[in-house]
Amino acid sequence: MSEKQTPVKELTLQEAQDEIKPLRAKLTKWGKEYYEQDNPTVEDHVYDRAYQRLVQLEEQFPQLVSADSPTQRVGGATESQLTKVRHEIPMLSMGDVFSIEELMDFNQRQQENRDVEVEPEYNLELKIDGLSLSLVYENGKLVQGSTRGNGTIGEDVTANVRTIKSVPAELPEPLSIEVRGECYMPKAAFAKLNAKREAEGLPVFANPRNAAAGSLRQLDPKVTAQRELDTFMYYVPEYQKIGVKTQAEALDRMRELGFNVNPNNRVVHNRDEIEKYIEEYTAQRDKLTYGIDGIVEKVNDLDTEVALGNTVKVPRWEIAYKFPPEEQATIVRDIVWTVGRTGNVTPTAVMDPVQLAGTTVSRASLHNPDYLREKDIRIGDTVYLHKAGDIIPEISKVDLTKRPADSVEYEIPTKCPVCGSELVHLDGEVALRCINPMCPAQIKEGLAHFASRNAMNIDGLGPRIIEQLWDKELIHDVAGLYRLNHDQLLTLDKFGEKSTANLLTSIDNSRNNSVERLLFGLGIRHVGAKAARIIMEHFGDLDSLMKADADEISAISGIGPTIGESIVTYFANQQVVKLIDELREVGVNFAYLGSRSNANPDSEWNGRRVVLTGKLTEMTRGEAKSWLENHGAKVTESVSKKTDIVIAGADAGSKLTKAQNLGIDVWNEQQFSQAMKEEQ
C-alpha cells in the first residue's frame, strides 16, 4: 500500500472503482494464504492497512459494495479433508483499531447508540495469537470440537481436540453448552517443534499461529498430540445457560467448569484505565510464554452485548486493539543471494545483530530486485527492522540521514551466485531467475521437494541428508535416489544400520506411489499437488500426459493454459525425457492409482465413505486404499456419522471404538477380501 494515496473523499466514483477491484483481489489472496493455507506472505499490519482502505472506500461509495468483498466475509473457505461442521451461532471475526483514539471513537459510537443504552464498563482481555476454536458439550461431555472456517462452516477437529490437555473431556456439571476460545502453541513448544523439524530436514513453521493451525487441523490425532497445543477459552454464546450477567463473570464461571482461561482480564471504566492496561501488556508481551497480537475490549454487560448485535461480519460489542509493530535500528553489512528450487534468486540483508521482539535478528529477506530498488537499500545503510506477525524480520525503512557520504546504489547481480549462468527476468515476473536446469542449488532444492510429504513422501530424506549425498557425489538427480545402496548410506554422518534401513525402505516404498505424487514431485512450474491429481485422474498414466498437447491439458476443468503450457514445455526438454526414462528403469510407478471418474458406477463401493484402521495381513493399507478408490470409494482418515464402513485389521484402536459407538458397519479383513473377490 502506498503512503501517498489520495484521500477517499477526494476520489471520483470511477477512481474508487478502479482502486477497489485490485485491492479486493489482493486481500482475497492474502486471506486465502492466512486462513486456508496457514502460510501468510505479508505481515498483519500490511493486511490491516489494506483492509481499512477498502472499508473506507466502501463506506464512501456504498454502491460499490459487493457480496464477495473481503469486508463481507469471515475467515476463509474450508477446503481441507476434514469433515465440515455447521456453526449454529456464526463465529464472527473482530473489527480492528490501531490507536487509542480509534478505540475511543468506537466506544463513543457505542454510547451514542440511539437504540441501546451502553454503560461505559468494559472487560479487557489479551488477544491470543492462535486460531479460533469451538467446543460443544452435551450433558457435560465433549461431543465436538471445530475451527471457525468461514464463520458458518468450520472443520471437525474433535479427535485432535481430545489430545489437548487443557480441554476437559467432561465438565463437573451436566451442561449442554458451546464454549469458544483460542487454540495456540506456547513459544517454548514452537521453538522445540521448529528445532526438531530443522534437524529432520523439514520446513519450519513461520510463526506459532501457523504451527497451531497446522497442528490442530492434522488428519492424524497422534501428530496433534505431539505438538503441545494449549487453549484459552473466553466466550459462551448462550451465557444464560451458565447463570452469568457479565463477561467477567463468564470467565470466572468457565474457570469453575475446568476450562483454561487467561488470568489477565480486567474490568475498566474510562480512558485512563484502558490506556494503562494497553501500556502494561505492550511492555510485557515479550515476557509472556504465549504470543499476543493485541488487546480485546468487550462490553461487560452481556444483555447489552446481545442488544448491540453484529454486522454481517463483526460484532458491535467488541473490538481488537492491534499492537503497532516494534522497530529496531541496525546497519546492513552485506546483501547475499540464494537460489531456490524453481531458479528464483532471492536477496537477503545481513545486518548487525539486534534484539527484536525477544529474539536476536541478523538477517532479513529483501524478496526481489524491485523491492530492493524501491526501498533503495544499500550496504552500510542504517535501517529499521520490525517483525512481520511478530515473527518474520523485515526492513520497514532506511534512515537516509545516516547514509554514508560514499554510499553507492546497490548493483543487482547478472549471474547466478551458484552456477554462474546468466540471470533473466521472465515475462510478468518480478523475480530474477537462473534458468540453468543443471544448477546445483536448484537440483538440491528439487531433491528436497521430490522427497517432501505431498510429493513422494520419502521419510527421513531432508536437506541435511541431501547435502551430504550431493557432496559425496552419490546422487545427481531424483532418479539417483533409487540407486542408493546400504554401503553408500552408511558413509553419511550420524547414519547407522537402523537409519540406513529406514531410509532405504522409505525410498523403496515411494516407487509404488500413485503417479500424481511423482508429477507434483518433479517440480514443474505452476503444478501444485491438487492440479497434479486432477491431471493424472484425467490421463491415467504419465506416458499419456507426455503425449498430450497444451490445448488438451488446458481443457481439463480447473487447469487452464498456464499449467498446460508449463507441462508441455517441461516435457519437451530432452534432459527431462532422459530423467523420466531413468525413473522408469528404476521401477517408479507411472500409473494413477486413485479413483477415476470412469470407475464402475455399478460397484457396491461407488460413492461409499470408508475408513481403514489397524494392521492388514493380506495386503498393505496403501494397496487396500488404492483398490477402494479404483472402485469409486472415498477413503477418509477419520470416522464420522457420514462414514459407511470401517475396515478393521489387527490392533485397531480408537477409530474402531468410535465406529462401534456410532453404529457404523465394521468389517474385518476376511470380509473385505471376500468382497474384493466378488467384485472381480
Swiss-Prot record:
GO terms, molecular function: DNA ligase (NAD+) activity; metal ion binding
Binding residues annotated for NAD(+), in chain numbering: D44, H45, V46, Y47, D48, S93, M94, E125, R148, E182, K298, K322
Protein name, per record: DNA ligase
UniProt-listed PROSITE patterns: BRCT, DNA_LIGASE_N1, DNA_LIGASE_N2
Family: Belongs to the NAD-dependent DNA ligase family. LigA subfamily.
Catalytic activity reported: NAD(+) + (deoxyribonucleotide)n-3'-hydroxyl + 5'-phospho-(deoxyribonucleotide)m = (deoxyribonucleotide)n+m + AMP + beta-nicotinamide D-nucleotide
Active site, per annotation: K127
